[in-house]
């Protein structure tokens, strides 16, 4: 089984660098279990199914990209990251270029009014450059994240030895992940609400 999954630009870069092998997604379905172990047992027995799949299933990444509106390719193709040009014999002006990792090139294109942004939700399957295989799935409270899992989420210490997230340093990995989580989910599912989340571990595979 193959399903799409959306990642932000920073998380795409973390996957491409090999630093991110895990993601947390809010459990949308209400869970009516009196104890935390009861929920884990129900997931293990398949009574509660993860909408992203089970170990062995594959995910293709949807990310923000740009579409060319018209540009003269002089001196050969743009030296871009993770992009092999148009697919399915497309006109290059209809090609989609991933934004993460190509910011400098896209800035030049934007200055020339040569491209428009396409939100990640609209990225078609053929344009995806990242394929993942699910290796493990479990459910837990958001605030139960461990230091090692925060690192698996793509957070790592900087040169000063402190964890880095959202452009600043934090005292520990959990605080860094809290900042990252709220930068994306604070409106609907803030850290303080401690929602149930799917913990999905994955490995990157070749298309």
Question: What would you call each of these model-derived segments?
Answer:
Residues 1-207:
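Secondary-structure transition motif
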